[in-house]
Amino acid sequence: MSMTPKLALQRLIDHTDFTHEEMLDVMQQIMGGAFTTVQIAGFLAGLRVKGETVTEIAAAAQVMRALSSKVEVEDSSYLVDTCGTGGAPTKAFNVSTASAFVAAGAGARIAKHGGRAASSKSGSADVLEALGVNIGLTPEQVARCVNEAGIGFMFAPNHHAAMKYAAPVRRELGVRTMFNLLGPMTNPAGAKRQVMGVFDRDLVSLLAHTLKKLGSEHVMVVHSADGMDEISFSADTYVAELKHGEVNEYTLNPAQFDMPLHEIDSIHVENAQQSSEIILGVLSGARGPARDIVLLNAGAAIYVSGIAGDLQDGIAQAAHSLDSGAALHKLQQLKALSQAA
């Protein structure tokens, strides 16, 4: 029996979880325009109140993946994404975007997925534009960037046309919904390795197990005690790491890596331009808090890529990427390739 909007909403009122097949059915209908905007809003709000399960998120991600415009790169086996959920209350600069260039400079192949700011001061698309990168590329042009420069950016709206029915509802609702979780799980290039920052500690284990169900290979899902959706330089970071088919949960602290503690305020920005200036400074060799948090997060990306044996090794390789100028060169390459497209 097809999961009609009325039946789906009744299931949520009854606090009943959906099976994998039921969630596939509902998502296909939402993405196909069968639900009205009011029904989509009711479904998303009800699902949030009930609480999303691994099965439900995985099924929804499968539908979004199937409907997305793919980026066909030459070898996707060791591709890394640093896309997070967004939604953290901090005003930090775009750490994951800076980390992507540093990881690429160390030899990791980066296929970064992202969009514009929703609740933050600057989304990855916003800061990349401020850095001079053309984000309006076709899937084929993004693939060329990854193949030739080792890094490419996939602007989410260009790859998820089926979101046209749900996107306006998300904006109007103004609260976090399941779609905040799906962005990092629907990489159009099929990256199976990623560092995913999340806005809530309760999501760390949930999303790591969801990515396991979706076939990811090496993933670190992170959230810090100070509220950051990054590996923090000021507090403990909660981690769920998927590797070799197993999820292990643990805590990281900057002291483990001989990192000094910093105040979060030291990396706050008000807009994409300020964020781009900090990133350019870090890539150009500037020392200080911004560099330290980038080292931690780029080190994680290098580690999950498979070219570092552990996080400590990844951090060391990240430092070399910055100090050698390799990370800055990756930004220059991506700018040139994207602008020439």
UniProtKB/Swiss-Prot annotation:
Mg(2+) 2 binds at D229, E230. Its cofactor is Mg(2+). Pathway: Amino-acid biosynthesis; L-tryptophan biosynthesis; L-tryptophan from chorismate: step 2/5. Mg(2+) 1 binds at S96, E230. It is an enzyme of class 2 (transferase). 5-phospho-alpha-D-ribose 1-diphosphate binds at residues 84, 94-97, 112-120, 124. One of its GO terms (biological process) is L-tryptophan biosynthetic process. The keyword Magnesium applies. Keywords: Amino-acid biosynthesis, Aromatic amino acid biosynthesis, Glycosyltransferase, Magnesium, Metal-binding, Transferase, Tryptophan biosynthesis. One of its GO terms (molecular function) is magnesium ion binding. Anthranilate 1 binds at G84. It catalyses: N-(5-phospho-beta-D-ribosyl)anthranilate + diphosphate = 5-phospho-alpha-D-ribose 1-diphosphate + anthranilate. Binds 2 magnesium ions per monomer. GO terms for cellular component: cytosol. Its EC number is 2.4.2.18. PANTHER family: ANTHRANILATE PHOSPHORIBOSYLTRANSFERASE. Belongs to the anthranilate phosphoribosyltransferase family. Homodimer. This is Anthranilate phosphoribosyltransferase. The gene is trpD.
